[in-house]
UniProtKB/Swiss-Prot annotation:
Protein name: tRNA (guanine-N(1)-)-methyltransferase
Gene Ontology MF, one: tRNA (guanine(37)-N1)-methyltransferase activity
Pfam families on file: tRNA_m1G_MT (PF01746)
HAMAP family referenced in this protein's UniProt entry, alphabetically: TrmD (MF_00605)
Gene encoding the protein: trmD
Length: 279
């Protein structure tokens, strides 16, 4: 996979040289190219911003440097590029909320281009124009505002790159974590390691009992409980057809009942057992 990142703060992307993402680049699994937006300016001050039409606070990034920068990227495609071109990812507080499902979708692409806005964002005509040429996804990390898109690029890149074959040593671990499709997008169950007892807190006995079926059942139950109490919005989207009788019983205890293609909360919530010392 190739990633092109257009930014005015290339130093911000240096953490991509570390840890598993850095190793993936060294192994040829990932090709990250950071491009300086200011290289596409034509005044001695290398200006990339100006005041917004209609007034208002702050400055807006000009379309001309962005047009030249993105055109230069598109003119240099990788050999395995999709005939439709790259997916242009624009971090923005007005974009779709980035999820694990979005990470999976982007990980299937051979080429991503990131446009890192600053100040009050990028002139709206840039996204409008490139929607006619490539696939564009405006993406938000959540309901808050950052100073620029670089932090979002770091997060999205890590979420996407770790899904590429060979980046994570044990690929099975990708299916045993929060939001994994293989576990219906539920939050991950509580996890424990040695010692068995620490500061008066014991590992649940079922995990040390050697009964693998019981362990898997406990993990599923705890995933359901944790999701119900911490992310009810996720649980509401759980497909009842994916639930067995035990799942339905656990959810009923928590006040959740099937409702069409999802679940509906209709009772009093039960405390998250992972926050207690109970097995």
């Amino acid at each position: 996979m190739r990633l092109d990142v257009v930014t005015i703060f290339g130093e911000y992307l240096q953490p991509l040289q570390l840890s598993l993402i850095g190793k993936a680049q060294a192994q040829g699994l990932l090709d990250v190219r950071v491009r300086d937006l200011r290289e596409h300016t034509h005044d001695r001050h290398r200006t990339v911003d100006d005041t917004p039409y209609g007034g208002g606070a702050g400055l807006l990034m000009k379309p001309e440097p962005w047009g030249e920068a993105l055109d230069a990227v598109l003119a240099d495609p990788p050999e395995d590029a999709d005939p439709r071109g790259p997916v242009l990812v624009v971090p923005s507080p007005v974009g779709e909320v980035f999820t694990q499902r979005a990470a999976v979708e982007l990980a299937a692409e051979p080429w991503l281009v990131f446009a890192c806005g600053r100040y009050e964002g990028i002139d709206a005509r840039v996204v409008e124009h490139y929607r006619t040429r490539v696939r564009v996804r405006e993406v938000s990390l959540g309901d808050y505002v950052l100073n620029g898109g670089e932090v979002a690029v770091l997060a999205i890149t890590e979420a996407v790159a770790r899904l590429l074959p060979g980046v994570i040593g044990n690929a099975a671990s990708l299916t045993e974590e929060s939001h994994a499709p293989e576990h219906d997008g539920l939050l991950e169950h509580p996890a424990y390691t040695k010692p068995a007892s620490w500061r008066g807190l014991d590992v649940p006995a079922v995990l040390a009992g050697g009964n693998h079926a019981a362990v898997e059942r406990w993990r599923r139950d705890e995933a359901l409980r944790r999701t119900a109490t911490r992310r009810p919005d996720v649980l509401a989207r759980l497909d009842p057809e994916r639930c067995d009788a035990r799942d339905l019983a656990v959810l009923a205890e928590l006040g959740w009942t099937p409702d069409g293609s999802g679940f509906r909360a209709g009772g009093d919530p039960v405390a998250d057992s992972s926050d207690t010392n109970e097995p």
